[in-house]
């Protein structure tokens, strides 16, 4: 009789342990499903876009219409880009230090583009300058001989608000830009956006009139996300 009682007690104990183990496992699984930090661990990492304002750090860039390229990009355009960059959900958008000139950092100090993670996409903004019949409109300097979808979206923004430069029809592929060459040799994806001519009063008027929309549309074009 004592043996039977002992066997029954052992069976009941094992059953209790088994039930407790299953209950604990179900509790852990339920907490993981409801905990966003656990879910985020398996989520796809956000792609990083680094946005760069051209020139700066003592290099004014192009002059025109009472301002300089470096000042206009940093004082007027950068704040609007920052505003809309905060709205994207599936990408990480950061900005190169506006107190620096990425070209100088790269070519003089061997930093800048040499220190950028190879998985980062770099988008540079500039304003063109010059005279003559073709000195108006913008275009995108691309990192491959043919434009990718992002380049086409960026060119569409230029066409919509400023107009395309008739010499390039939206794009140019150049191998004589030393900073861009560093990015290309390192296998880093990039686009350089020439927004329009700072020396052309019609271009500059359009850019100023639509600056907020240009910034919003550029962020959407870069990240391929829709901002409400």
Language model regions located:
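A short, glycine/acidic-enriched catalytic loop
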Residues: 59-68, 129-161
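Structural recognition of the beta-strand scaffold that forms the well-ordered cores
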Residues: 49-53, 92-97, 120-125, 139-142, ...
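Long, well-ordered alpha-helical scaffolding segments within enzyme catalytic domains
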Residues: 77-82, 147-165, 204-228
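Solvent-exposed loop/turn segments at secondary-structure junctions
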Residues: 56-59, 99-103, 127-132, 145-148, ...
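Active-site histidine-acidic residue metal-binding/catalytic motifs
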Residues: 33-110, 136
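Sec-dependent N-terminal signal peptides of Gram-positive bacterial secreted proteins and lipoproteins
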Residues: 1-26
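Mature extracellular/periplasmic domains of secretome proteins
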Residues: 105-119, 180-186
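Active-site-adjacent mobile loop/cap segments within catalytic or ligand-binding domains
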Residues: 124-128, 172-228
């Amino acid at each position: 009789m004592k043996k039977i009682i002992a066997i029954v007690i052992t069976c009941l104990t094992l059953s209790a342990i088994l039930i407790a183990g299953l209950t604990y496992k179900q509790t852990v699984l339920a907490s993981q499903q409801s905990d966003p930090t656990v879910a985020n661990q398996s989520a796809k990492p956000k792609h990083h876009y680094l946005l760069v304002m051209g020139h700066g750090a003592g290099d004014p860039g192009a002059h025109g219409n009472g301002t300089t390229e470096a000042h206009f990009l940093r004082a007027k355009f950068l704040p609007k880009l920052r505003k809309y960059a905060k709205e994207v959900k599936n990408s990480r958008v950061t900005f190169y230090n506006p107190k620096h000139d990425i070209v100088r950092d790269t070519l003089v100090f061997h930093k800048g583009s040499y220190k950028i993670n190879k998985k980062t996409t770099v988008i540079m903004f500039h304003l063109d300058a010059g005279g003559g019949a073709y000195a108006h409109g913008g275009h995108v300097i691309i990192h491959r001989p043919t434009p990718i979808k992002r380049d086409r979206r960026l060119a569409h923004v230029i066409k919509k608000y400023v107009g395309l430069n008739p010499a390039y029809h939206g794009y140019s592929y150049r191998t004589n830009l030393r900073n861009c060459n560093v990015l290309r040799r390192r296998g880093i994806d990039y686009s350089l956006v020439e927004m329009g001519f700072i020396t052309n009063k019609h271009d500059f008027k359009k850019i100023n009139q639509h600056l907020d929309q240009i910034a919003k549309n550029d962020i959407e074009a870069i990240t391929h996300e829709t901002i409400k």
